[in-house]
A protein has these predicted regions:
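Arg/Lys-rich, low-complexity, intrinsically disordered basic segments
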Residues: 1-130
Length: 130
């Protein structure tokens, strides 16, 4: 499944939603801070993202998936909520679906990392016992 050097191709639907999010942010002047803007830039401009960005995208959606879509003015086209603008900037519903797929890959990488640390510790302990 990969390691921390793996790159994750950004689906076209995610890119399109990220562009819409940027347009909304420009029109209304709110929604998303420095991290959201940086990720939005990557989603719009790059072909793929690295492990660190993939983790941030996954973290965003896990934190916001039950809150933002239910928030006030989420579907208001004239005055959208900050939550909607951020949601779109992070890739919208397409980004949410993509993040669920990314999560599986990220989980494998994190489990491999933990297993490697355990094995390293066991080897160190084994070396002390000799």
């Amino acid at each position: 499944m990969g390691d921390k050097k793996t790159r994750y191709k950004i689906p076209s639907g995610v890119k399109e939603e990220a562009r819409r999010g940027r347009t909304l942010r420009t029109m209304h002047g709110y929604g998303g801070g420095k991290v959201t803007k940086a990720i939005n830039y990557r989603l719009r401009v790059q072909k793929d993202v690295g492990y660190g960005t993939a983790v941030k995208i996954d973290t965003y959606y896990r934190r916001h998936e039950d809150v933002d879509p239910k928030g006030e003015n989420f579907d208001n086209r004239k005055r959208p909520s900050k939550g909607l603008i951020m949601w779109k900037m992070m890739g919208g519903n397409a980004g949410h679906s993509w993040s669920k797929k990314l999560k599986k890959s990220l989980d494998v990488i994190q489990k491999k990392e933990r297993l490697n640390k355990i094995n390293q510790t066991l080897e160190e302990i084994h070396g002390m016992v000799r």
